[in-house]
């Protein structure tokens, strides 16, 4: 199985969410995009951060994980 590129190498801002928890980094399990950390310089349209459905070969089911990607690349 080829591992998914979830954007863990893209710098992101680790901030506290309104619910008091820290935002989730690329690869963390999530239930909505608002939980995911945004890429640094997210005021530009270069990067997108969202909660995405991914196949987990280890668990043999779909899971939701935070993902950050460059919107101009094919990885998004």
UniProtKB/Swiss-Prot annotation:
Question: Which UniProt keywords are given for this protein, alphabetically ordered?
Answer: Disulfide bond, Ion channel impairing toxin, Knottin, Neurotoxin, Secreted, Toxin
Q: Which organism is it from?
A: Apomastus schlingeri (Trap-door spider)
What's this protein's family per the entry?
Answer: Belongs to the neurotoxin 21 family.
Which chain positions lie within coiled-coil regions? none
The record's tissue-specificity note reads: Expressed by the venom gland.
| Record's signal peptide | none
Q: Name one Pfam family in it.
A: Cys_Knot_tox
Q: What is this protein called?
A: U1-cyrtautoxin-As1c
Q: Where in the cell is it found?
A: Secreted
- Entries under InterPro entries matching the protein: Cys_Knot_tox
Is Heme a UniProt keyword of this protein? no
Query: What are this entry's molecular-function GO terms?
Result: ion channel regulator activity; toxin activity
Its domain description in UniProt is:
The presence of a 'disulfide through disulfide knot' structurally defines this protein as a knottin.
What is the role of the protein in this entry? Answer: Insecticidal neurotoxin with probable ion channel impairing activity. In vivo causes a rapid, irreversible flaccid paralysis that results in death.
Which residues form each disulfide bond in the chain? 23-37, 30-51, 36-66, 69-76
GO CC entries: extracellular region
UniProt entry tagged with the keyword Manganese: no
């Amino acid at each position: 199985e080829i591992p998914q590129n979830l954007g863990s190498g893209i710098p992101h801002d680790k901030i506290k969410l309104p619910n008091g928890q820290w935002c989730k980094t690329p690869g963390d399990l999530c239930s909505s995009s608002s939980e995911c950390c945004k890429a640094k310089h997210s005021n530009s349209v270069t990067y997108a951060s969202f909660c995405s459905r991914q196949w987990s070969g280890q668990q043999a089911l779909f899971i939701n994980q935070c993902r950050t990607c460059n919107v101009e690349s094919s990885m998004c």
